[in-house]
Every structure is written in C-alpha cells, then in structure tokens.
Amino acid sequence: MSFKSTASKHQAQTTVSKLFANILPNHTIGNDEDKQEKLSSTQLLSNQLKQSSVPLKKVKKKTNAKIKKINDSNTKFKKFVKYNIIKSREEHTVEEQKYLKKLVKRNASQIKNLSHIDNMQIEEELSDVRASLIDKIGKKENKRLRKRKLTSAKNSKFDDFDNKVKRGFISVPGLTPGLAPIDYNESDSE
C-alpha cells in the first residue's frame, strides 16, 4: 500500500499495531526509538509542547510572583522616601497636605483593625504616638476652630452650570413657546 506522507503511514501503522496489541497478548507496539524516527516534525513538536507546557506555567507563575514582590518593595521604598522628604520640610503644599492626611487616615484605620497586640513595646509606642497626636491636635492657639462649609464638587458643578445658563453662555436645547408643535396637548403627555 502506498502512502502520501510519512505521517499518514505512521498513523496507519500505529493504529494497526494498537489493534493487534489489544487482540494478541504477546504483540508489542514497537520501540521508542522507532517511534521517534517515524514521527513527523509537527508530531515531534506537538509532543515537546505537551511535555513542557506544564512546567512552563509553573515557571511563569514563579517569575511573575518574584516580579510582583520586587515591584511591591520598590513602591514601598518610593513611598517611604516621599514621606521622609515631605516630613523634613517646614511648609507643605496643598498636595502634600492631602497626601499626609491620606497617610494618617490609612495608618489610623490599620491601627484600629488591630484587635490585640501581644508585644508590650509596641503598645507603649502606640500610646506615645496617640498622646503626641492628641497634643498636636489639641494645640490650636491662634487658629480658627470653625471653617466655612465648603460645597461639594458635585454641587459646585451644578451651580456653575446654572450660572452659565442664566448669563447666556450656554443654551439649553428645548422648545420655545412660539415653536411648539401644532397638535401638541399637555394633557396627552401625562
């Protein structure tokens, strides 16, 4: 029998040898060396990919975990440096004040989440920090205690839009009384 390619010949031979192996008890399918010689290049490639795909996933997972850990440590270090730079200055810009307030809120929430601390030194340090914060907050001499109420950004956007409409900078689409449709009744729309 003639075959068009070695792959089809190999497939036919393996099918027949598997059939004989199921029927005849002493029949062997063939040597591994013969299989390697008779396999086409695509079959060899697919076999290699099947065998090496599982370890590649594990290796990729490990490398991604290492990269993530390095990135996390880099970001923590950058945040620490930024905090120390801001902390060393006497006067802070508005952005720096916002950043410091955000840090205070985050750290305060983390402290609140700790239910019980076993180490006595840490408890003493926390109580010292709390006391110093209360002292700093409590000393508001020569400062206003009340500030004027600020409108939220959402309300200010609406107010700005309404002011622009009133001044005529923005026109709102709609019907004017003279351009209403002829057969339009207000009672029909309700």
Curated annotation (Swiss-Prot):
Keywords: Nucleus, Transcription, Transcription regulation. It comes from the Eukaryota. It is found in: Nucleus, Nucleolus. Its main location: nucleus. GO terms for cellular component: nucleolus. Belongs to the RRT14 family. Involved in ribosome biogenesis, probably through modulation of rDNA transcription. This is Regulator of rDNA transcription 14. It comes from Scheffersomyces stipitis (strain ATCC 58785 / CBS 6054 / NBRC 10063 / NRRL Y-11545) (Yeast).
